[in-house]
Amino acid sequence: MTVTLDQPKDQRLVQSEISWQQFKLIQQGFSNSPGIRLFYYNSEVEILSVSQEHEIFSRMIASLLIDYFVEKDIEFNPLGSYTQEKGEEVSAQADESFLIGKSTGITPDLSIEVVFTSGGKRKLTRYQALGVPEVWFWEDGVFGLYHLRSHAYEKIDQSEVRPGLDINLLSRCLLMASRVEAVKEFRRGISGV
């Protein structure tokens, strides 16, 4: 008899009361571990082991956004999940990040996280400390968009760093079973054909 067990989509471990120096040692220990995301803020470390499904959504989001930037003739730099840090205060690895337009700084204009575990919105404080203007969470098949105002993130319906982007089209395409059809549909939608 074969028994199939549902595997968790992502695995998450959070540990409090960790110093920055301890975090850097943990970070060093995971330096050659693919599929691991590390976060640090307020003496708390989060270690996230991402699933194949997580990576599929992450890559599809990036791929479709790159298609959008190219179609709309928008300069961009895809930063992927590079480690964003500020002093000894905060470290984050978004699933995808982008510098948009002529931006040349180290702080992305947009960071995106795929969330299969809890804690999406609570992660905003990390990005606020980093000064990231806009953060998107892909959770339960929909995007939650947040734009940084003077002292906090505000939930928004439409991206302010990419106001012409149809978020509903992007979401719909991400949920399509065929990746090829999803890309074709998205390209048709953004080109107006």
Predicted features along the sequence, with ranges:
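Gly/Pro/Ser/Thr-rich low-complexity, intrinsically disordered segments predominantly at protein N-termini
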Residues: M1-L130, F137-V193
